[in-house]
Amino acid sequence: MPKLSAAELRQLSGEELRNKVRELKEELFGLRFQSATGQLENTARLREVRKDIARVYTVLQERNLNIVDDPDSTKEA
């Protein structure tokens, strides 16, 4: 899975972002389990997933603080 960019994340709806966080957390759990059992080959993926989760939370917080417009609320007629 490639790195998620903030610009791509800003195009997603709030529900899609929450689903993305859930998926990433599940992946992180699996990676941590593999790491603990010594089966993890790509250790850099742990860091990538943690940073992706932080990016999603940042976009959600920007919307909560009205720093950027929510694509759900700016539907044009």
Swiss-Prot record:
Belongs to the universal ribosomal protein uL29 family. It comes from the Bacteria. GO terms for biological process: translation. Keywords: Ribonucleoprotein, Ribosomal protein. This is Large ribosomal subunit protein uL29. The keyword Ribosomal protein applies. GO terms for molecular function: structural constituent of ribosome. One of its GO terms (cellular component) is cytosolic large ribosomal subunit.
